[in-house]
């Protein structure tokens, strides 16, 4: 059976796409095209920017081989800003994925309707396909940097200063505390805005959060 293309159905396909990302971790970790990690997929769905817009998910595309998802093309929070997830065994789909983005995921920008697709800079072949379809490389200022820490490099024990302790969200799920930590972690001064607490609570409601 040839690879089939269809719309992403939320919430029915949500877990299956997450499993697809996990399945392709090992195959894509070294590039040239690196897929999202599953936590970002969850964050995308539980971010307040998407609240009330869930019907727009049907514009995203999935490619399946039998019952297996082998590729996905989707926006995150802004229509027209697009990401590609691809099983490396199906590299021949690259042109189809980008064509789908052009036809279904265009957004409105200051210069008019457009599609911005983030591709891994190590995947020169994907870049060639994009250029053949009329895409132009964005400036370095518009690049998106992703940092990953291999599990093998995570220390078994974490030492913190006296008076501090490391707790999991299952031990202390005080949303206000987490909101304050993240606010300070992004180098903001003062206390976090209280009117953002519900938005933070929504983000923290993602089922895979630890």
Which role fits each region the language model picked out?
Residues 18, 25-29, 39-45, 76, ...:
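Long, contiguous binding/interaction regions
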Residues 69, 76-162, 170:
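Acyl-donor-binding surface of acyltransferase catalytic domains
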């Amino acid at each position: 059976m040839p690879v089939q293309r269809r719309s992403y159905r939320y919430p029915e396909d949500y877990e299956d796409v997450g499993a697809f990302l996990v399945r392709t971790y090992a195959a894509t970790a070294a590039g040239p095209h690196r897929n999202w990690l599953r936590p970002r997929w969850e964050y995308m769905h539980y971010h307040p920017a998407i609240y009330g817009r869930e019907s727009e998910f049907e514009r995203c595309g999935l490619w399946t081989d039998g019952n297996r998802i082998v590729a996905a093309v989707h926006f995150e929070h802004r229509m027209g800003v697009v990401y590609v997830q691809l099983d490396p065994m199906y590299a021949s789909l690259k042109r189809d994925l980008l064509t789908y983005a052009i036809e279904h995921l265009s957004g409105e920008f200051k210069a008019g309707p457009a599609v911005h697709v983030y591709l891994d800079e190590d995947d020169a072949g994907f870049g060639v396909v994009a250029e053949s379809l009329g895409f132009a490389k964005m400036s370095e200022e518009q690049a998106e940097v992703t940092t990953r820490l291999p599990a093998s490099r995570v220390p078994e024990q974490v030492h913190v200063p006296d008076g501090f302790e490391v707790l999991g969200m299952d031990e202390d799920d005080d949303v206000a505390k987490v909101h304050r930590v993240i606010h300070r972690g992004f180098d903001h001064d003062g206390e976090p805005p209280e009117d953002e607490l519900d938005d933070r609570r929504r983000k923290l409601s993602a089922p895979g959060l630890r």
